[in-house]
Design a protein with these regions (language model features):
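C-terminal alpha-helical interaction module
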Residues: 1-276
Length: 276
């Protein structure tokens, strides 16, 4: 999909497919139906559809319909949904290992609510009061994540095992300094300056773990926000920085890195409410 334009303030006509591979690098035409708009697929699946035309979308070519469009569910379902056609070695790979499921579920709850969704609550606030109440929540979650990575010894959120939590956190953290600090005004701190543990974790995923860098396109990320939200950025000017988008220099020994955080009293109060 092209990151912009997405249409009017009600989302019509919504996400567009490029006509060719060259129209917008990194965005591909619809290979199944050659649709121009994503909404065409929603109406193909259900002619009476009344909801939003959102991504991601998982289309089943056997039943010829959308089977899921919820990212959290897809993150879980794709781990096992195709095991029957995968080699045994690949079918055994999981980001939701049984021994860590209770902890993953516990962390996922506040991470989704306060961090993944939290940046949008802050960024789309319509009043100063709403903005002021939502921004500290985001940084309380980042403070907690910072300490968790350090306490578990890295290189991942829960220690030596790559889990769903790393995927969930990455999607927000990799965008944070690039988009959320300026576009959503989440500017109490930055990942690279205020969260050295998270920054080190990000460096490892982006530069060392296959699949993360390859699926991250900073032009798409920036233009998806800066050229789509006319009420926030009416001139649609896209900032150049930060540079580099993700720093290099991963330190495998997390104990050698200081534990950072935003020390604003309201942030610390909300962090404490998240528990130990």
């Amino acid at each position: 999909m092209k990151p912009y334009p997405k249409g009017d303030d009600k989302g019509w006509p919504g996400w567009q497919f490029p006509a060719t591979d060259q129209e917008y690098p990194g965005a591909n035409p619809d290979p199944l139906f050659h649709a121009k708009y994503l909404h065409e697929l929603y109406f193909k699946a259900d002619p009476e559809y009344k909801g939003r035309y959102s991504v991601p979308v998982l289309w089943d070519t056997q039943t010829d319909t959308i089977v899921n469009n919820e990212s959290a569910e897809l993150l879980r379902d794709l781990q096992t949904g195709f095991n029957s056609i995968l080699p045994e070695s690949d079918a055994g790979i999981t980001l939701y290992p049984e021994q860590l499921r209770e902890k993953i579920d516990e962390v996922s709850d506040w991470m989704q609510r306060d961090l993944n969704t939290g940046v949008y609550k802050a960024g789309f606030a319509r009043t100063q009061e709403d903005y002021d109440s939502n921004v500290p929540v985001v940084f309380a979650a980042l403070n907690k994540l910072e300490k968790m990575i350090h306490a578990n010894g890295g290189p991942y959120v829960l220690g030596k095992d790559l889990t769903e939590l790393d995927v969930r956190a990455y999607a927000t953290v990799v965008r944070f300094d690039t988009v959320y600090v300026q576009h959503f005004k989440c500017n109490l701190g930055t990942i690279r300056h205020d969260y050295p543990q998270i920054n080190n974790w990000l460096k490892n995923l982006y530069w060392n773990v296959e699949g993360f860098k390859e699926t991250t396109d900073f032009r798409h990320i920036k233009e998806n926000y800066t050229k789509s939200h006319g009420d926030i950025n009416p001139l649609a000017i896209t900032p150049m920085g930060p540079w580099p988008a993700v720093e290099e220099g991963w330190q495998p020994q997390v104990e050698k890195i200081r534990v950072g955080g935003v020390m604003m009293p309201k942030v610390l109060e909300l962090e404490a409410e998240l528990g130990p």
